[in-house]
A protein has these predicted regions:
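Membrane-helix and juxtamembrane interface regions of eukaryotic multi-pass membrane proteins
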Residues: 1-145, 157-253
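Generic alpha-helical transmembrane segments
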Residues: 144-152
């Protein structure tokens, strides 16, 4: 019950911030071209992108700091990687609180499709399982460092149907593809591999094996979803780069 109240309180704070951002961006969005997608012209769509960027910056910064700390540990510290980490405990609460608020409000405003609903639910479940064990610091860091890619993504999602040919929209798309590959595919896949491969030998004694297997299955499912998206994102970024290269050649001619 205490954990549910904790998540609920953070989700409530994020929900208020989410809605407040929608009101604060009115002067800026009113000067933007309209989106070709009707639901994106709802001011709360822009507010969600601002709130999501704040979450990505806060959670990503904390998680990347934790990853650096793990990377600079002496070799043979696998047991430490499966223990808790104070930074990740706080980042996990921030992250899960936002995911809950974003899921509820996103459904309410009709911003989420089926794939993103599954994505949110998987992340909430994984973080809840990890927090219930009070451990898995490295795993939590690899998961939450993926939020770094949300910074260029949120700008791209805001502008892709408003000014698709603007240089900043294209730059954000390519930057997101690079960040997605680095944090969500490379770092995220390593985190899943590390947990699945080493959990049998380094799982804390007080954690039930069934719970660890459930967490491992959730990680694999989330990772498969990331790779599915990664192929699509990579193709889109390649098209942007080819179009840019073709335009440069045409100007030179």
């Amino acid at each position: 019950m205490e954990t549910l109240l904790l998540y609920g309180s953070y989700a409530a704070v994020w929900a208020v911030l989410w809605l407040a951002c929608g009101l604060l961006v009115v002067p800026v969005v009113s000067r933007m071209p309209p989106s070709s997608k009707a639901h994106e012209n709802n001011i709360m769509y822009a507010g969600q992108k601002v709130a999501a960027s704040l979450k990505a910056w806060a959670v990503g910064s904390i998680a990347n700091l934790a990853l650096y700390q793990y990377a600079t540990m002496p070799t043979g510290s696998l047991g430490v990687a499966f223990a808790g980490h104070p930074l990740m405990d706080f980042a996990g609460i921030l992250f899960t609180g936002f995911e809950v608020a974003d899921l509820v409000l996103g459904l309410g405003y009709g911003f989420l499709d089926a794939t993103h609903i599954v994505h949110h639910i998987l992340h909430i479940a994984i973080c809840a399982l990890a927090r219930a064990t009070c451990g898995f610091g490295l795993l939590a860091a690899t998961l939450m460092a993926q939020e770094t890619s949300g910074l260029p993504l949120n700008y791209y999602l805001l502008m892709r149907h408003r000014a698709p040919d603007h240089w900043s929209t294209r730059a954000a798309q390519v930057a997101f593809a690079g960040a997605f590959f680095l944090w969500r595919l490379l770092v995220g896949t390593y985190g899943t591999y590390h947990f699945v491969y080493h959990a049998r030998d380094h799982l804390p004694a007080d954690i039930p094996s069934a719970q660890a297997r459930l967490l491992g299955a959730s990680l694999v499912a989330a990772n498969v979803l990331q790779w599915y998206w990664g192929v699509t994102i990579g193709k889109m970024a390649a098209r942007v780069l080819r179009a840019h290269a073709g335009g440069s050649k045409a100007k030179a001619a």
